Amino acid sequence: MNGIGCASVGPPAGAAPGKPAGVTVGEILRTHACDYIASRGGKVPAYELRVMQELAACRTAALGGHVSECDHCGAREYFHHSCRNRHCPLCGGAVRARWLDRCREDLLPTLYYQTVFTLPQELRLLTLANPKVGYDLLFKATAETLQEVAATPKHLGAKIGVMLVLHTWGRSLQYHPHVHGVVPGGGLSPDGTRWIAARDKFFLPAKVLSRMFRGKFLAGLKTAWREGRLRLEGELASLADHETWEKWLSPLYRKNWNVFVEPPPCEVAPHPEAVFKYLARYVSGVAISNSRLEGLAEGRVTFHWKDYRQDGHEKFMTLSAVEFLRRFFQHLLPPGFVRIRHYGFLSMRQRTQALPLCRQLLKLAGVVTPELGDPLAVPALPQAAESPTCQARLCPVCGQGQLRVVANWRRPTLPELMTMRVWSTVSSCNAPRRTPPPERPPT
């Protein structure tokens, strides 16, 4: 009998196609989590510790798994469970594919526009200290701005639908909170009897959006301060004084806030695949993918990133493992926070009745694009690979037999996982693993 691991018959989980398996966020955690915790003075919130533990244990024996065995040659593969944490670089792909498959029927046969609303640098420390308040306000100000400007007759005069996705990172892992939006290029007339299309390749004026967004966000921030919903500690402690607070806010009313509105990258091809491709970049994303990690050596992490200020030129950055983890974990979302939200006729309350009406009115208006055709006949998305537990697979060793599950070891409960030592206390040590079940002879 051959006892083989899954790494011997294919690239390990997280390896990019055509690229040798490299370092992962989980590996960095397993070797340097203790250093990171020490750099925080041992004071890490329980929720962050849970995320650290789950990401470090992802697809290792610590989370349990199963063994598949070939019924012809006896070759074995060992599969470990995924952590399913939404901050995990290994687990986002399958979630993204399933989400896109569920939402594909919502696409309308019209050009879509992308929007980006970004908070100015001066607000980042305050937002980082108050993520729930700051992110909720960012969503609210963005959605209200888009809908109110679109409803103005001189701009569009229509009720629109909006999907917003929160991002908190830049390409080099710096804290950069902003919201990406995807908006159909038009909307329903106020009386709901016709579709009002946006002008060719022009949706809404960015300058008007920027000014309204700025006013709404700052008004909401003032309300949060007045109601005592902001944590003002450390460097922010002086802002608890009313006069200091007003003086600090004042320049932000004169600053230009960055807002972008443009068609998708493939402007001349507004078909479903183009929209899906755009959506896929922003759904279930994490601060950095494992494919961008180049190396981990002597306590330092190297990764590549694109500098769009220099036409997307690829650069490399090396950080200490502790600094890398600090940057990574500043992008943790508050527990239970919803980072993808829908508004207008795309909201959960309206979409059931509004979307069929939109399709009907688009057809009557004669704006159905030939590339899109029937809006319901959208090609199926590639599905995430099914778990080997769900079906037998052809043996990659002999090419004749079927791999079938012959043994399982269960996933630990959260309390059990939190008591495990999944990271090392010495950076040169490998993370310990749970002992898999004893091998069972083939039946």
Where are each of the predicted segments found?
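Beta->alpha loop/short-helix hinge microenvironment recognizer with preference
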Residues: 1-443
